[in-house]
Amino acid sequence: MTSVAAIPEYRTLTPDALDALERAVRERRRVALRRRGTEYVVVAERLETSGRDEVLAGRLPMTGEVLAFRLRDLETFAVLP
């Protein structure tokens, strides 16, 4: 029997959470995130600073549109395998 590791879901911006996002950007991984009750799955493009906010830019796989998500607005996120 094979055990499957759980995908870590982050609810706060801890150093581990930021490391996971940075790794997702480097590896162009998918990120499932929830903002204002809406769930998105995007391909991580870049992390940047906008004013006083850190922003994740993610591309929607179906349309190719790039959306910007302020990290402080995220309720949860998980980097998908």
Where are these regions (language model features)?
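Short glycine- and basic-residue-enriched patches
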Residues: M1-P81
